[in-house]
């Protein structure tokens, strides 16, 4: 969401957009640790410290919040926060019971963690685009700061690769190495002569899961953030007229993308527990 006015037009629109889409970076240089401008050519070995800070911080907030609510839970009339937590827990538990057909006590807590964590990271997109970055620049001297972790492909890909690792782990644990290998080589065509074709098809299908998971979440949140930034370039009266409706619509995107990421994770892990 945007709050800036005509003063943002003192820089070019492309500069403004580029500035808000650039992460705070840390990298290793010849003289030791370098930050931001010095990391332009660091390549792969660059840490997006803002994405790490906000994603870990929101994860800790989620754990602390649910822990406190669990400690203070009452059997009487619950408060609003307890109602929200109970709704999340019961909703995810029902989804797991309906969608997951194996036996694994980890799936429901994992689904809850993914949903709430991704939801909180997405929710940061509703904070005005200039509010936190401008405060960080003025008071901390930080030139770049992105506060929405899920607009960073590194974060969404990291989440998706974690899910992918669980898919492979449980596929081998439940079916054994032989069963997992057979799944990759004897489907969809159950003939030894077609093993190479089966292997290519099944490998592509398997690898496509984390790629689609990460790109779907990243693409939707990145596009939403970009629209907020474009609205921030407009006059103040246009900002209010456009940002409020877009923010209301974006709430649906925030919740829906968290739900989709959780739901697909549960479905993929359910498939990993099944024999085809």
From Swiss-Prot:
Location relative to the cell: Cell inner membrane
Key words of the record: ATP synthesis, Cell inner membrane, Cell membrane, CF(0), Hydrogen ion transport, Ion transport, Membrane, Transmembrane, Transmembrane helix, Transport
One Pfam family from the record: ATP-synt_A
Q: Which residue windows are transmembrane per the record?
A: 47-67, 107-127, 152-172, 188-208, 226-246, 247-267
* Membrane topology designation: Multi-pass membrane protein
Keyword Secreted listed? The answer is: no
One term of GO molecular function: proton-transporting ATP synthase activity, rotational mechanism
Q: Which GO terms describe its biological process?
A: proton motive force-driven plasma membrane ATP synthesis
According to the UniProt record, one GO cellular component term is:
proton-transporting ATP synthase complex
- Record keywords: Magnesium included? no
Assembly behavior: F-type ATPases have 2 components, CF(1) - the catalytic core - and CF(0) - the membrane proton channel. CF(1) has five subunits: alpha(3), beta(3), gamma(1), delta(1), epsilon(1). CF(0) has three main subunits: a(1), b(2) and c(9-12). The alpha and beta chains form an alternating ring which encloses part of the gamma chain. CF(1) is attached to CF(0) by a central stalk formed by the gamma and epsilon chains, while a peripheral stalk is formed by the delta and b chains.
Role, per record: Key component of the proton channel; it plays a direct role in the translocation of protons across the membrane.
What does the similarity note say?
Answer: Belongs to the ATPase A chain family.
Name the UniProt record assigns to this protein: ATP synthase subunit a
The organism is Shewanella pealeana (strain ATCC 700345 / ANG-SQ1)
């Amino acid at each position: 969401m945007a709050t800036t006015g005509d003063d943002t037009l003192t820089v070019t629109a492309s500069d403004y957009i580029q500035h808000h889409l650039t992460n705070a970076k840390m990298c290793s240089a010849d003289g030791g640790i370098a930050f931001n401008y010095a990391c332009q050519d660091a390549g792969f070995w660059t840490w997006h410290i803002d994405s790490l800070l906000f994603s870990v911080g929101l994860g800790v907030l989620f754990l602390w919040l649910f822990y406190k609510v669990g400690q203070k839970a009452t059997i009487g009339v619950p408060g609003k926060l307890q109602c929200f937590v109970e709704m999340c827990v019961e909703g995810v538990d029902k989804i797991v019971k309906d969608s997951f057909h194996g036996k694994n006590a980890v799936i429901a807590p994992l689904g809850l963690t993914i949903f709430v964590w991704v939801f909180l990271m997405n929710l940061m997109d509703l904070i005005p685009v200039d509010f936190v970055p401008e405060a960080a620049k003025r008071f901390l001297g930080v030139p770049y700061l992105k506060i929405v972790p899920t607009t960073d492909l590194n974060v969404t890909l990291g989440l998706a690769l974690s899910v992918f690792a669980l898919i492979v782990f449980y596929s081998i644990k439940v079916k054994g190495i032989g069963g997992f290998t057979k799944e990759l080589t004897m489907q969809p065509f159950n003939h030894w002569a077609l093993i190479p074709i089966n292997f290519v098809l099944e490998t592509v299908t398997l690898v496509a899961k984390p790629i689609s998971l990460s790109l779907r979440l990243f693409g939707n949140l990145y596009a939403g953030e970009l629209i907020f930034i474009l609205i921030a370039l407009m006059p103040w009266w246009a900002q209010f007229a456009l940002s409020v409706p877009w923010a209301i619509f974006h709430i649906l995107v925030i919740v829906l993308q968290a739900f989709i990421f959780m739901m697909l994770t549960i479905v993929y892990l359910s498939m990993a527990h099944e024999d085809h």
